[in-house]
């Protein structure tokens, strides 16, 4: 007959398990953060491709965005929102946006690290409105989409322009950085140096404050 474990032995085993768990938790959390970052990169790759496909089908024009003002239902943007009231995290309907036929997925609009409850985690460069892909002087350095915040200080309305009230701020959801897609199609993680830097890109002067 096997001798049963003593209370001390059981406590030692429990203590060892607790120590191992404490050692593993940071690594597991970091792995989860990395997985969320990778998922966000994939989202923006799919959205960026949708922008390109739309341009191919519409004589090189970028998809439009809506102007962020309240008091109207905004049709025809890359995402759709109901402006009653001014855009909030709950009144987007991505299935009515002009890019949804290309994405065919609600999930690509949402970063897994975005815990605000918003239906859209990204904002489009405001200078793409009424512009063509061929007008971009430096596609590699000109952001197309970025992660936009949605807090009491800022609003996420599907386009990004810091010269707007409330302010548009980039949000760092991934290891003190953020994921950006660029007009040449590449997507990368970058660290933004100042949340109040001008984010309305001039096509001849791409954002460099990373």
Model-based region annotation:
Residues 4, 35, 194:
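Alpha/beta-hydrolase active-site loop signature
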Residues 1-32:
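N-terminal single-pass transmembrane signal-anchor helix
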Residues 38-210:
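Short, well-structured segments within or immediately adjacent to enzyme catalytic domains
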Residues 23, 32-43:
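Juxtamembrane interface helices immediately C-terminal to a transmembrane segment
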């Amino acid at each position: 007959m096997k001798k049963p474990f003593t209370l001390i032995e059981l406590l030692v085993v429990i203590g060892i398990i607790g120590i191992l768990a404490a050692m593993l938790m940071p690594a597991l959390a970091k792995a989860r953060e990395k997985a969320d970052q990778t998922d966000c990169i994939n989202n923006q790759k799919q959205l960026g491709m949708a922008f390109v496909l739309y341009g191919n089908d519409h004589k090189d024009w970028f998809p439009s965005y809506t102007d962020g003002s309240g008091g109207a239902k905004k049709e025809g943007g890359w995402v759709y929102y109901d402006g009653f009231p001014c855009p909030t995290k709950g009144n987007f309907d991505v299935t009515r946006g002009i890019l949804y036929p290309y994405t065919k997925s609600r999930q690509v609009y949402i970063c897994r690290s975005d815990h605000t409850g918003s239906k859209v985690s990204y904002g489009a460069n405001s200078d793409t409105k009424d512009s063509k892909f061929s007008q971009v002087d430096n596609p590699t350095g000109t952001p197309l989409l970025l992660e936009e915040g949605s807090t009491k200080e800022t609003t996420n309305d599907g386009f990004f322009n810091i010269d707007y009230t409330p302010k548009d701020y980039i949000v760092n959801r991934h290891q003190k950085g953020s994921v950006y897609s660029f007009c040449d199609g590449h997507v990368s993680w970058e660290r933004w140096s100042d949340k109040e830097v001008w984010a309305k890109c001039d096509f001849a002067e791409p954002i460099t404050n990373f």
